[in-house]
Structures are given as structure tokens and as C-alpha cells.
């Protein structure tokens, strides 16, 4: 799984995110999800 695909592709909710992809990706870091947080 790619960190970029997992973060933006599925996001935290596992849904195809576009404009909110960035926002969800950042918040994903705090949530214990199988998504590797970047910054």
C-alpha cells in the first residue's frame, strides 16, 4: 500500500476524497488508522 494512495485515495473514512482529502489526511494522523501520516 502506498502512503500517498492510502492517505488521499481512501482517507480516514475509506471514501474517495478530493478537496477534503488534504483535511482528512492531516486529521488521520491523530486517529489510530492503518494510514501512514506524513507531516
Curated annotation (Swiss-Prot):
Expressed by the venom gland. Residues 19-39 are annotated as: Disordered. Residues 1-8 form a propeptide. GO terms for molecular function: hormone activity; toxin activity. It comes from the Eukaryota. One of its GO terms (biological process) is regulation of blood pressure. The keyword Secreted applies. Pfam families: ANP. Keywords: Disulfide bond, Hypotensive agent, Secreted, Toxin, Vasoactive, Vasodilator. One of its GO terms (cellular component) is extracellular region. InterPro entries: Natr_peptide, Natr_peptide_CS. It is found in: Secreted. The keyword Secreted applies. Disulfide bonds join 12-28. Its main location: secreted. Belongs to the natriuretic peptide family. Snake venom natriuretic peptide that targets both NPR1 and NPR2. Exhibits hypotensive and vasodepressor activities. This is Natriuretic peptide NsNP-b. The lineage of its organism: Eukaryota, Metazoa, Chordata, Craniata, Vertebrata.
Amino acid at each position: 500500500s502506498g502512503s500517498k494512495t492510502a492517505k488521499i485515495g481512501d482517507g480516514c473514512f475509506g471514501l474517495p476524497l478530493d478537496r477534503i482529502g488534504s483535511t482528512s489526511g492531516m486529521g488521520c494522523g491523530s486517529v489510530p488508522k492503518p494510514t501512514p501520516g506524513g507531516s
